[in-house]
Amino acid sequence: TIHGKSAHGMMPQNGINGATYLALFLSQFDFQGNAKTYLDLIAETLHKDFFAEKTGLAYTDPKMGELTMNAGVFSFSKESEDNTIALNIRYPQGVDTDAIKAGLEKLEGPKAVSLSEHGHVPHYVPVNDPMVETLLSVYENQTGLKGHEQIIGGGTFGRLLKRGVAYGAMFPGYVNTMHQANEFTEVEDLYRAAAIYAEAIYELI
């Protein structure tokens, strides 16, 4: 039995991908044809390739950080010629989908590469933007802590606005159970966040 551990798609290095570990185990046996090609690709290239180094897509932006890759959905049948692997790739500014597709097409094994973009192009608002400065000032006033920008690979509603940003609500020492079993937050953190949001709204309007 292989036990995996879930993690947010933007931080695959924090999880344990049971599927790639299974492929790593199975690849030692004498499979042939499509099965061998499929297992070898997963075991030799995708297994623990969180930053797409083995796939040749690795990239780091000075502001937005590293491209991340999570091999998340696998579908294989010995009767099928359409066996698939879905990769969740979070990429910063400086990378585009054409480069990602071209890189994946160079891998040994895949017969075709298709992209589903969901309209999620990289989104960044500079720390010296007046709105961001206001939000950081409110955080500092409410907590007594130094505020700073934080770049994440997760999709947020902030991207719906040209100058939109995600704002909270993870405080220092926060136990991050996001998208995991038994996800929770502390009630006290909810109170602290509500006070910050109230002042932020007041200052922005």
Regions found by a protein language model. Give the residues of each.
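Glycine-rich, charge-dense phosphate/pyrophosphate-binding loop(s)
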Residues: 53-55, 133-134, 158
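Substrate-recognition/cap regions that form aromatic- and gly/pro-loop-enriched pockets
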Residues: 76, 83-154
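A short small-residue
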Residues: 2-8, 113-118, 174-181
